[in-house]
């Protein structure tokens, strides 16, 4: 018999209640809980009170959460990956193609497949005392993560299945530096690159190493330790990777931002908040930005419910009246309602733009669940909903990878056919290419001058968009962040004169600023996208006209080239909107994260930081009283001014447009270089006229055509 569990989990009887029922001291009951040996008179009293028979009472054992089991659907995606890469590797030698053709037609295909066919990641986020590691251990089926996880270190732990361990390593645990060459986040996707792996690694060993670097008891809480990876033979990791993140809100805001930026890598978010203090305002402010950054996987034509990759967990649920279901349902309802009251009216707009679905508070409420190892029934809904998403997501990834490969092949076929036609025409119609080269050289100076003028116009337009963004934001702030405006909002929205209502209002007010700023930036970025589209079309027309006059095929794809260049730059500002709009199905945005709207997440770090500063300095309870609306408004305006909130937004917007301008300059310089190289190579081919080399290229291109036709999709 487990007497303590019998009282708490089965009959829901407190020690105080049993004390009165049996007329015994509470200390005596605690002794029985320790030795599981209550006297028969107590058993009889419990049987009489509950209706349970003696055998049920005496044989009762604490319920145990069943081992989490899910169907291994990643094997289908893994099969696709192995099949395609085996096909590519087996055919590369047979294709007999040079590096230039390989780079032009095959490298992006390989990179896109690599980026698409990555296991989904689950991130566990919450304050340091919410039981993240306990929940992870339960899902893993063994105590791999230390339950005494420290809030004083910014280390993120990636859990992967042992089958995914790179061939060049043997140990279970690896610790990586927090920074290297100016980069602050170790890229877990590059673990199969030995040189990269070794450069970031600072320690390796067994699971004890994780305890040394990541717990209060450990003696190696080194500042330079930023991430760890653990390889475990756990069934759940066959379908997904897990990221265990340090609790936020424990030390510096910068650590919270690091946690947030790491969580953005995830495809599934599990947010934990203690049931006994569920969804406090700090949770709400942090979760709002987490959800904004969460990939939108649900669409009208797939099996996923709305917000399928989000679970908000009321953890340690046994602490609420011994896990009383009615009390917990009310806690979930109230937490969801507080969250809903704290978001701006257009909070869901960016997600709706991707999914074409509308979102309600009820949709969000469906993602709120309970969890505690002490009462298995309170884990069922969490496990059922998690099981759905981790079983279905690998199938979605597999399908998207296949669609990507098909779209890529279809998109490159045209250029491939044009290049093949070029070499065939060079054999039979060389004179036309001699004329073409002469015509290009004759017109190139003027074309370059015209192109330079267009580039300068776009540079000026980017600067103009930057000023417009700042001006519109400043105008919005001057009208919104005022005592009069805030008082009016408080009255119009009928905010109640209590701490919780005012906290929700302040959170919503800040969220509205985030949303409005993102909307302004999105509109300006969309405007730039139209301009870049027109520029690329104009660029293509300017080089195509010389070919068109001679009825020759053009095999220089300016659009594809420009997009490839942008994707390789890294920080691209507003050009990211252009890539999403024009080339979202290509390798540039492979994987689930490509569905995220940039402007919706750009200001998330500010939202997290400002939210913490506002509530730390507001002292809301002291403001409530007879003239509370004006008191709250004055204090809120004062906090915005004190923390220079508007300036922080302007800094982000300025950097966004500066990054845009720098990326555009790099892209057009490289585009022009590649066009010059193309013309130079074409001239060399026409002038030297090496028939053997031309025929070899024809053979290679036909081999690539056959390769595309027979690719196993």
Model-flagged regions — what are they?
Residues 112-396, 589, 602-632, 636-647, ...:
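Globular "head" domains of long coiled-coil molecular machines
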Residues 6, 12-35, 40-129, 142-231, ...:
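N-terminal low-complexity/disordered regulatory or targeting extensions
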Residues 429-671, 675, 679:
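A non-catalytic, extended alpha-helical scaffold characteristic of dynamin-superfamily P-loop GTPases
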